[in-house]
A protein has these predicted regions:
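Conserved catalytic core of the tyrosine transesterase superfamily
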Residues: 1-170
Length: 170
């Protein structure tokens, strides 16, 4: 997985900085460096991103309340480029650029399709959820199995769910 993620990062950074490619880089950063769920990414609004304080406010799975997360420096950089390009002031952070629904909020299905096309091009066998799995596995390793800390940073309510990841790693 490390090699695939490095290949994906290299591919994204080598792309010309077109609006579509900037959107792809931002999506990949939120999945890879933040471990966000697909639903958390598509629910993001422009107002949820605070680049000055390097935070984002995430509306979790099945929740209406938003919780702050710290943004990785790479995520801050690509989000800044993305927002400077699109100049969105409010509303959905990620929007469709297809002809029949241009400007609408991206759906989880459309995000999966975007990522699936890139994976196919790079011959990566994976899924969008694989990013989250990778992120959580990294957290478990860096916190040496301290699942309370991992649950905080992964926004996993269930320690039992994290034990599944932990058992795979240890």
């Amino acid at each position: 997985h490390d090699a695939d993620n490095e290949k994906l990062q290299r591919y994204c950074s080598d792309l010309p900085s077109t609006p579509q490619n900037l959107r792809l880089r931002a999506l990949v950063a939120l999945f890879l460096f933040q471990g966000l769920r697909q639903i958390e990414v598509v629910r993001l609004d422009v107002g949820d991103i605070d680049l000055r304080n390097k935070t984002a406010f995430i509306r979790g799975k099945g929740r209406d309340d938003k919780e702050p997360i710290h943004l990785h420096p790479s995520t801050v950089r690509v989000l800044r480029e993305y927002l400077n390009c699109y100049r969105f002031r409010s509303g959905a952070l990620f929007r469709s650029d297809s002809n029949h629904c241009r400007g609408d909020r991206l759906t989880t299905k459309s995000v999966r399709e975007i990522i699936k096309r890139v994976f196919a091009k790079l011959e990566i066998d994976g899924s969008v959820h694989g990013f989250r799995h990778f992120f959580i596995s990294k957290l478990i390793k860096s916190y040496k199995g301290e699942l309370l800390m991992v649950s905080k940073y992964s926004r996993h309510r269930s320690i039992q769910m994290l034990e599944v990841y932990n058992d795979e790693i240890i």
